[in-house]
Amino acid sequence: MDPNCSCATGGSCTCTGSCKCKECKCTSCKKSCCSCCPMSCAKCAQGCICKGASEKCSCCA
């Protein structure tokens, strides 16, 4: 569980555009929770969902 996030790993997340999660792996987490994408990834902000920093994100080149 991410100390900056109230949701359980793999669960539903209530954070959206103002997400402060750093290692959040919630299935519904979006935007800045996308740990496998760079912070400036425009496509990520459009709804990319990543489940781990080690995964390659399909939204990023």
From Swiss-Prot:
Any Gene Ontology CC annotation: cytoplasm
Residues bearing PTM N-acetylmethionine: 1
PANTHER family registered for this protein in UniProt: METALLOTHIONEIN, METALLOTHIONEIN-1A
Binding positions (a divalent metal cation 1): 5, 7, 21, 24
Location of the region described as Beta in the Swiss-Prot/TrEMBL record: 1-29
Phylogenetic lineage: Eukaryota, Metazoa, Chordata, Craniata, Vertebrata
Pfam family, one: Metallothio
PROSITE patterns: METALLOTHIONEIN_VRT (PS00203)
Paired cysteines (S-S): none
Name of the molecule in the record: Metallothionein-1A
Region (Alpha): 30-61
Binding site for a divalent metal cation 3: 15, 19, 24, 29
Annotated positions binding a divalent metal cation 6: 37, 41, 44, 60
Domain characteristics, as noted in the entry: Class I metallothioneins contain 2 metal-binding domains: four divalent ions are chelated within cluster A of the alpha domain and are coordinated via cysteinyl thiolate bridges to 11 cysteine ligands. Cluster B, the corresponding region within the beta domain, can ligate three divalent ions to 9 cysteines.
Subunit structure: Monomer.
Species: Homo sapiens (Human)
Purpose of the protein: Metallothioneins have a high content of cysteine residues that bind various heavy metals; these proteins are transcriptionally regulated by both heavy metals and glucocorticoids.
Residues where a divalent metal cation 7 binds: 50, 57, 59-60
Modified positions (Phosphoserine) in chain numbering: 58
InterPro entries: Metalthion_dom_sf, Metalthion_dom_sf_vert, Metalthion_vert, Metalthion_vert_metal_BS
Superkingdom, taxonomy of origin: Eukaryota
Designated gene of the protein: MT1A
Record-level GO BP terms: cellular response to cadmium ion; cellular response to copper ion; cellular response to zinc ion; detoxification of copper ion; intracellular zinc ion homeostasis; negative regulation of growth
Gene Ontology MF terms: metal ion binding; zinc ion binding
SUPFAM superfamilies found in the cross-reference section: Metallothionein (SSF57868)
Binding residue positions for a divalent metal cation 4: 33-34, 44, 48
Family that this chain belongs to: Belongs to the metallothionein superfamily. Type 1 family.
Residues reported in the UniProt entry to bind a divalent metal cation 2: 7, 13, 15, 26
